[in-house]
């Protein structure tokens, strides 16, 4: 059973004003670095694979490509709740500072890889997992640090800036990766080190804990079940999109079925364990707070709908559109990042504004509008031809970025405002799990949908294209069985596999013009365009449905909700206190709580002092002081 201690050591007056800005700048730097490192490898993968001499045409090597990306994100999804709990127990700043140091050390280690082939791929995956552990410390505690540092009427602004940095970093990483990777693939890792050192020293020097603590035990069973369950599901997806026997995909493989069933069973067992242990990883009673539940459901659906979007655009631009417009494969990574900047711009415009306005008007109108607009942009992408004109593509990307900006900052602020002070670390961690797990699953889902769309069309398209260039029918038949995952990753890596698949002996006996066409930059992208378009249609439809459901969840969150512990004492300026989604403009007196069907955990003036697992906690009746 947990107990909370609320002996505040927070600064007051001018010191508090200075401290909150220091906390904002440092946590924003931390979140920015982590998010840049989530995406910087997407665009740098061609140079990394060439640098470590890993052949993308070997289907089994797709495991390394996927897990170089997924390993980092999986760790953040698995650990963020536990590390948020450790922040509640031992100090959010202490855990945050440790995370900055760990993240920096592994960023340096990633740049000293001397191996090649699969050994180098395994080393990068391992070091990325270590880097992700450091990033998990930062993600799990940054929102709670800001919520402690800022008053309720500025919290949306602070969390909005922090959230903007986190999502903008995903797009900045694309451009940075495109700039650095052609120079040396190791630069995409070492670039974070000096900023990490700066952030670590700054955090240890300037940040300090609020003094709010929770005594609790770590839910080891829950952590293990969740980690193993989610990992098994992702491993099952990884092997499911690889060929199996004579099938283009491996969903009938006993290994795939076993890992997927085992993963789902582990996650089901996790839910049972969480309802019974004294100090669960997921504090299920927090889901009785309507604003917390609705905000997290909306966040999960939005992340599932949009998590794989960036990868689709990178493949579309880097593997098809840019080569068709005369850009060499060596330069496609940089230009793919540049051409995606409208999405970043849209998000940077809408994110901070919606955060500030949501402090005044509540999260529901902005978050709901954001998901409705996102749904419409997915529908718009369905009508774009594969070889589109850039102007409408850029407009749709900018509007999609604005939609995410409208949603993200208000939704995050509403989630954090709904939590009692001593539960902010755990609550932020739970919210992070929803978002990060959904992002990881979204990547697997989008890759699966794309490959499903490609698999039905690719063989006959390849065969016809090869025969049209005078390739013998027997050779064309053999090459047409190229696994869909190989073609998809060749597209992602900006790689034309035709010369290697046909071999010098076949090319030497073809007319000179045909040999030139087959090994040129446009033949493979042109052939892949039709199958790729079918895959895009499936993926965009899925994204539109997920975002529409996120809009519905956002509508159901209720009116503005602020936990009663945030209310001002009588005699101060009137505070807006909301319980169970019902707003009131009545100031709350110290020692008095607002009675509602769910109950408000906490009291006016200074934090809650209840045991979260007992009556008077988030799920119980009025708290006592």
Task: Label each residue range with its predicted role.
Residues 24-36, 40-73, 254-258, 266, ...:
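Transmembrane core module of solute transporters
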Residues 2-204, 354, 381-382, 393:
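Transmembrane-helix bundle of Major Facilitator Superfamily
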Residues 48-49, 86-87, 176-182, 237, ...:
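Interfacial helix-cap and linker-helix signal at transmembrane-aqueous boundaries
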Residues 26, 33, 102, 109, ...:
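Hydrophobic residues within membrane-embedded alpha-helical segments of Major Facilitator Superfamily
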Residues 1-35, 291, 359, 371, ...:
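Transmembrane-helix exit segments and adjacent C-terminal regions of multi-pass membrane proteins
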Residues 31, 69, 73, 159-167, ...:
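Small-residue-rich transmembrane alpha-helices and their cytosolic helix-loop interfaces
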């Amino acid at each position: 059973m947990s107990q909370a201690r609320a002996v505040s050591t927070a600064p007051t007056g001018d010191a508090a004003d200075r401290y909150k800005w220091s906390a904002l700048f440092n946590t924003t730097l931390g979140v920015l670095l982590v998010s840049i490192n989530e995406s910087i490898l997407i665009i740098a993968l061609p140079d990394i694979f060439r640098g470590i001499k890993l052949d993308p045409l070997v289907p089994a090597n797709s495991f390394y490509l996927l897990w170089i990306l997924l390993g980092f994100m999986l760790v953040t999804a698995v650990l963020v709740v536990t590390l948020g709990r450790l922040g509640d127990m031992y100090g959010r700043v202490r855990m945050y500072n440790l995370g900055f140091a760990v993240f920096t050390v592994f960023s340096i280690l990633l740049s000293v890889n001397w191996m090649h082939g699969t050994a180098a791929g395994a080393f990068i995956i391992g070091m990325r997992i270590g880097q992700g552990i450091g990033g998990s410390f930062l993600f799990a505690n940054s929102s709670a640090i800001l919520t402690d540092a800022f008053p309720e009427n500025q919290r949306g602004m602070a969390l909005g800036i922090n959230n903007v940095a986190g999502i903008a970093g995903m797009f900045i990483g694309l451009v940075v990766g495109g700039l650095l990777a052609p120079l040396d693939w190791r630069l995409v890792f070492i670039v974070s080190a000096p900023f990490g050192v700066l952030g670590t020293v700054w955090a240890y020097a300037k940040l300090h804990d609020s003094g709010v603590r929770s005594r609790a035990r770590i839910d080891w069973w829950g952590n293990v079940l969740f980690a193993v369950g989610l990992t098994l599901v992702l491993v099952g997806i990884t092997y499911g999109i690889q060929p199996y026997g004579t099938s283009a995909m491996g969903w009938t493989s006993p290994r795939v079925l076993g890992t997927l069933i085992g993963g789902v069973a582990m996650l089901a067992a996790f839910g049972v364990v969480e309802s019974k242990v004294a100090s669960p990883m997921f504090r299920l009673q927090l889901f009785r707070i309507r604003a917390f539940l609705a905000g997290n459901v909306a966040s999960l659906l939005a992340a599932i709908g949009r998590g794989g979007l960036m990868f689709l655009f990178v493949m579309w631009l880097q593997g098809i559109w840019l080569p068709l417009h005369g850009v060499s494969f060596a330069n496609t990574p940089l230009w793919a990042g540049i051409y995606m900047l409208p999405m970043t711009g849209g998000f940077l415009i809408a994110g901070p504004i919606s955060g500030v306005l949501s402090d005044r008007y509540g999260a529901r109108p902005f978050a709901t509008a954001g998901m409705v607009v996102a749904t419409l942009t997915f529908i718009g992408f369905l009508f774009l031809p594969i070889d589109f004109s850039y102007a409408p593509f850029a407009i749709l990307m900018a509007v999609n970025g604005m939609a995410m900006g409208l949603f993200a900052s208000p939704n995050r602020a509403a989630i954090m405002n709904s939590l009692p002070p001593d539960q902010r670390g755990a609550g932020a961690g739970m919210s992070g799990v929803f978002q990060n797990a959904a992002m990881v699953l979204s990547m697997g889902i989008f890759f699966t949908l794309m490959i499903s769309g490609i698999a039905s069309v690719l063989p006959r398209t390849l065969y016809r294209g090869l025969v049209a260039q005078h390739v013998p029918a027997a050779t064309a038949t053999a090459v047409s069985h190229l696994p869909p995952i190989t073609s998809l990753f060749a597209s992602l890596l900006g790689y034309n596999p035709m010369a290697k698949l046909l071999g010098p002996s076949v090319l030497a006996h073809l007319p000179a013009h045909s040999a030139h066409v087959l090994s040129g930059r446009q033949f493979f992208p042109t052939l892949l365009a039709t199958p790729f378009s079918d895959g895009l249609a499936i993926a965009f439809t899925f994204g539109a449905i997920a975002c529409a459901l996120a809009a519905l969840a956002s509508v159901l969150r209720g009116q503005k909700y602020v936990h009663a512990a945030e209310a001002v004492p009588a005699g101060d300026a009137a505070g807006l206190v909301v319980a169970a989604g019902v707003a009131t403009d009545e100031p709350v007196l110290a020692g008095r709580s607002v009675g509602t069907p769910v109950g408000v955990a906490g009291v006016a003036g200074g934090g809650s002092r209840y045991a979260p697992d007992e009556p008077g906690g988030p799920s119980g009746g009025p708290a006592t002081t």
